[in-house]
Protein backbone atom coordinates (compact mmCIF):
# COMPACT_ATOMS: atom_id res chain seq x y z
CA UNK A 1 0.00 0.00 0.00
CA UNK A 2 1.56 3.35 -1.01
CA UNK A 3 2.33 5.91 1.67
CA UNK A 4 -0.04 8.83 2.04
CA UNK A 5 1.53 12.19 2.61
CA UNK A 6 0.04 15.41 3.85
CA UNK A 7 0.12 18.47 1.61
CA UNK A 8 3.11 19.90 3.52
CA UNK A 9 5.01 16.61 3.26
CA UNK A 10 4.35 16.46 -0.49
CA UNK A 11 5.74 19.98 -0.93
CA UNK A 12 8.89 19.06 0.98
CA UNK A 13 9.29 15.88 -1.08
CA UNK A 14 8.93 17.81 -4.34
CA UNK A 15 11.58 20.32 -3.28
CA UNK A 16 13.88 17.48 -2.20
CA UNK A 17 13.39 15.61 -5.46
CA UNK A 18 14.14 18.70 -7.53
CA UNK A 19 17.27 19.61 -5.54
CA UNK A 20 19.56 16.93 -6.98
CA UNK A 21 21.09 19.27 -9.57
CA UNK A 22 22.61 21.38 -6.78
CA UNK A 23 24.62 18.35 -5.68
CA UNK A 24 25.67 17.72 -9.28
CA UNK A 25 27.00 21.29 -9.43
CA UNK A 26 28.76 20.72 -6.11
CA UNK A 27 30.30 17.53 -7.48
CA UNK A 28 31.49 19.36 -10.61
CA UNK A 29 32.99 22.16 -8.52
CA UNK A 30 34.85 19.74 -6.27
CA UNK A 31 36.19 17.81 -9.29
CA UNK A 32 37.48 21.07 -10.80
CA UNK A 33 39.04 22.00 -7.44
CA UNK A 34 40.79 18.62 -7.26
CA UNK A 35 42.10 19.14 -10.80
CA UNK A 36 43.34 22.62 -9.91
CA UNK A 37 45.18 21.38 -6.83
CA UNK A 38 46.92 18.44 -8.50
CA UNK A 39 50.02 20.51 -9.31
CA UNK A 40 50.41 21.87 -5.77
CA UNK A 41 52.41 19.56 -3.56
CA UNK A 42 53.56 19.25 0.00
CA UNK A 43 56.37 17.13 1.35
CA UNK A 44 56.32 14.46 4.02
CA UNK A 45 59.93 13.47 4.61
CA UNK A 46 61.15 12.71 1.05
CA UNK A 47 57.69 12.18 -0.43
CA UNK A 48 55.99 14.71 -2.64
CA UNK A 49 52.20 14.47 -2.28
CA UNK A 50 49.57 16.60 -3.96
CA UNK A 51 46.93 18.56 -2.08
CA UNK A 52 44.19 17.05 -4.24
CA UNK A 53 44.45 13.80 -2.25
CA UNK A 54 42.37 15.52 0.43
CA UNK A 55 39.69 16.53 -2.08
CA UNK A 56 39.30 13.19 -3.90
CA UNK A 57 37.54 11.40 -1.00
CA UNK A 58 34.98 14.22 -0.90
CA UNK A 59 34.29 13.68 -4.62
CA UNK A 60 33.31 10.06 -4.00
CA UNK A 61 31.34 11.03 -0.90
CA UNK A 62 29.23 13.55 -2.85
CA UNK A 63 28.61 10.99 -5.61
CA UNK A 64 27.55 8.42 -3.02
CA UNK A 65 25.29 11.00 -1.39
CA UNK A 66 23.58 11.68 -4.73
CA UNK A 67 23.18 7.93 -5.25
CA UNK A 68 21.72 7.38 -1.81
CA UNK A 69 19.33 10.34 -1.86
CA UNK A 70 18.35 10.66 -5.52
CA UNK A 71 19.17 7.35 -7.17
CA UNK A 72 21.54 5.74 -9.63
CA UNK A 73 20.37 7.70 -12.69
CA UNK A 74 21.05 11.08 -11.07
CA UNK A 75 24.54 9.93 -10.12
CA UNK A 76 25.27 8.88 -13.70
CA UNK A 77 24.18 12.34 -14.85
CA UNK A 78 26.40 13.89 -12.17
CA UNK A 79 29.44 11.86 -13.19
CA UNK A 80 28.93 12.64 -16.88
CA UNK A 81 28.43 16.34 -16.24
CA UNK A 82 31.38 16.68 -13.88
CA UNK A 83 33.65 14.74 -16.26
CA UNK A 84 32.62 16.95 -19.16
CA UNK A 85 33.11 20.11 -17.09
CA UNK A 86 36.55 18.85 -16.03
CA UNK A 87 37.64 18.65 -19.67
CA UNK A 88 36.02 22.00 -20.52
CA UNK A 89 37.71 23.64 -17.54
CA UNK A 90 41.11 22.29 -18.61
CA UNK A 91 40.46 23.47 -22.17
CA UNK A 92 39.42 26.98 -21.12
CA UNK A 93 42.27 27.35 -18.63
CA UNK A 94 44.86 26.25 -21.18
CA UNK A 95 43.74 29.09 -23.46
CA UNK A 96 43.52 31.58 -20.59
CA UNK A 97 47.10 30.94 -19.49
CA UNK A 98 48.34 30.78 -23.07
CA UNK A 99 49.27 27.11 -23.37
CA UNK A 100 48.28 24.69 -26.08
CA UNK A 101 45.61 22.25 -24.99
CA UNK A 102 46.72 18.65 -24.97
CA UNK A 103 44.11 16.01 -24.25
CA UNK A 104 46.97 13.74 -23.24
CA UNK A 105 47.57 15.95 -20.20
CA UNK A 106 44.05 15.37 -18.93
CA UNK A 107 43.33 11.90 -20.33
CA UNK A 108 44.72 10.00 -17.34
CA UNK A 109 42.84 12.10 -14.85
CA UNK A 110 39.62 12.04 -16.90
CA UNK A 111 39.66 8.29 -17.54
CA UNK A 112 40.68 7.54 -13.96
CA UNK A 113 37.90 9.76 -12.67
CA UNK A 114 35.13 8.38 -14.88
CA UNK A 115 36.08 4.70 -14.58
CA UNK A 116 36.63 4.87 -10.81
CA UNK A 117 33.37 6.76 -10.35
CA UNK A 118 31.41 4.13 -12.25
CA UNK A 119 33.13 1.31 -10.36
CA UNK A 120 32.37 3.11 -7.09
CA UNK A 121 28.79 3.79 -8.19
CA UNK A 122 28.12 0.19 -9.20
CA UNK A 123 29.49 -1.28 -5.98
CA UNK A 124 27.78 1.36 -3.85
CA UNK A 125 24.41 0.81 -5.54
CA UNK A 126 24.79 -2.93 -4.94
CA UNK A 127 25.49 -2.26 -1.27
CA UNK A 128 22.49 0.06 -0.98
CA UNK A 129 20.12 -2.50 -2.42
CA UNK A 130 21.51 -5.66 -0.81
CA UNK A 131 22.94 -4.63 2.58
CA UNK A 132 21.95 -2.48 5.52
CA UNK A 133 24.70 0.12 5.46
CA UNK A 134 27.80 -1.80 6.47
CA UNK A 135 30.60 0.51 7.62
CA UNK A 136 33.39 -1.82 6.49
CA UNK A 137 31.92 -2.48 3.04
CA UNK A 138 31.30 1.22 2.43
CA UNK A 139 34.85 2.05 3.51
CA UNK A 140 36.26 -0.65 1.22
CA UNK A 141 34.19 0.76 -1.65
CA UNK A 142 35.87 4.14 -1.19
CA UNK A 143 39.32 2.57 -1.01
CA UNK A 144 38.75 0.42 -4.09
CA UNK A 145 37.66 3.53 -6.01
CA UNK A 146 40.99 5.17 -5.12
CA UNK A 147 42.94 2.13 -6.28
CA UNK A 148 41.08 2.13 -9.63
CA UNK A 149 41.60 5.89 -10.01
CA UNK A 150 45.36 5.66 -9.46
CA UNK A 151 45.62 2.59 -11.69
CA UNK A 152 44.11 4.42 -14.67
CA UNK A 153 45.90 7.67 -13.88
CA UNK A 154 49.25 5.86 -13.80
CA UNK A 155 48.44 3.76 -16.86
CA UNK A 156 47.34 6.61 -19.12
CA UNK A 157 49.08 9.72 -17.86
CA UNK A 158 52.38 8.38 -16.61
CA UNK A 159 52.67 5.50 -19.13
CA UNK A 160 53.33 3.17 -16.21
CA UNK A 161 56.51 5.03 -15.33
CA UNK A 162 57.38 4.06 -11.82
CA UNK A 163 59.88 6.27 -10.09
CA UNK A 164 62.09 5.33 -7.15
CA UNK A 165 59.60 6.45 -4.53
CA UNK A 166 56.40 5.70 -6.48
CA UNK A 167 55.16 2.86 -4.29
CA UNK A 168 55.96 4.68 -1.07
CA UNK A 169 54.02 7.74 -2.21
CA UNK A 170 51.23 5.53 -3.59
CA UNK A 171 50.65 3.76 -0.28
CA UNK A 172 51.12 7.00 1.67
CA UNK A 173 48.42 8.59 -0.46
CA UNK A 174 46.07 5.66 0.11
CA UNK A 175 46.71 5.76 3.87
CA UNK A 176 46.03 9.51 4.09
CA UNK A 177 42.90 9.17 1.99
CA UNK A 178 41.85 6.16 4.02
CA UNK A 179 42.02 8.16 7.24
CA UNK A 180 39.80 10.84 5.72
CA UNK A 181 37.47 8.16 4.37
CA UNK A 182 36.94 6.75 7.86
CA UNK A 183 35.26 10.02 8.81
CA UNK A 184 33.33 10.27 5.54
CA UNK A 185 32.18 6.66 5.84
CA UNK A 186 30.82 7.40 9.30
CA UNK A 187 28.69 10.20 7.80
CA UNK A 188 27.80 8.09 4.78
CA UNK A 189 26.40 5.24 6.85
CA UNK A 190 24.16 7.66 8.76
CA UNK A 191 22.57 9.28 5.68
CA UNK A 192 19.00 8.16 5.17
CA UNK A 193 18.03 6.66 1.83
CA UNK A 194 15.99 8.81 -0.51
CA UNK A 195 12.83 7.99 -2.40
CA UNK A 196 14.54 6.50 -5.46
CA UNK A 197 16.24 3.65 -3.59
Language-model regions: role of each:
Residues 5-6, 57-59, 160:
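Short hydrophobic/aromatic segments of transmembrane alpha-helices and their interfaces
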Residues 31-39, 89-97, 153, 157, ...:
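Structural signal for membrane-spanning alpha-helices in multi-pass inner-membrane proteins
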Residues 20-21, 167:
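A residue-identity detector for tryptophan
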Residues 106-197:
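Membrane-embedded alpha-helical hairpins and interfacial helices in multi-pass inner-membrane proteins
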Residues 1-17:
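Short, Lys/Arg-rich, polar N-terminal cytosolic tail immediately upstream
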Residues 13-15, 22-27, 37-109, 113-114:
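Alpha-helical membrane segments and adjacent membrane-interface helices in multi-pass membrane proteins
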Residues 1-5, 64-84, 115-133, 188-189:
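Generic hydrophobic segment detector
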Amino acid sequence: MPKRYTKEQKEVLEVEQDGWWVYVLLLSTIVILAHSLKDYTFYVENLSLTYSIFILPVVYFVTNYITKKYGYAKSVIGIAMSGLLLVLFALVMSFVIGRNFSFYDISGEFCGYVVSQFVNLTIYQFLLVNTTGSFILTFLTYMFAFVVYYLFYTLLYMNLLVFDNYWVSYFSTLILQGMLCLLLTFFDVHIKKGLEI
